Amino acid sequence: DEEPKETCSDEMCVIYCKGEEYSTGVCDGPQKCKCSD
């Protein structure tokens, strides 16, 4: 089970919730995120 757990201080990142793309925004909180270019 590979989940996106990259830490990025970029404003362009995809927040994942339960393995699904939840929303786009700043990486903040315990949510896992995957940096998107």
Curated annotation (Swiss-Prot):
Which Pfam families does the record match to this protein? Toxin_31 (PF08119)
The record's account of tissue expression is: Expressed by the venom gland.
Q: Which GO terms describe its molecular function?
A: potassium channel inhibitor activity; toxin activity
Which Cys residues form disulphide pairs?
A: 8-27, 13-33, 17-35
Q: Which GO terms describe its biological process?
A: envenomation resulting in negative regulation of voltage-gated potassium channel activity in another organism
> One GO cellular component from the entry?
extracellular region
Sorted keywords for this record are: Disulfide bond, Ion channel impairing toxin, Neurotoxin, Potassium channel impairing toxin, Secreted, Toxin, Voltage-gated potassium channel impairing toxin
> Where is the protein localized?
Secreted
The highest taxon in the source lineage is Eukaryota
- Cited InterPro entries: Parabutoxin
The UniProt entry's sequence similarity note says: Belongs to the short scorpion toxin superfamily. Potassium channel inhibitor family. Alpha-KTx 11 subfamily.
Role summary: Binds and inhibits voltage-sensitive potassium channels. Inhibits the vertebrate potassium channel Kv1.1/KCNA1 with low affinity.
Show the domain comment.
Answer: Has the structural arrangement of an alpha-helix connected to antiparallel beta-sheets by disulfide bonds (CS-alpha/beta).
Q: What is this protein called?
A: Potassium channel toxin alpha-KTx 11.2
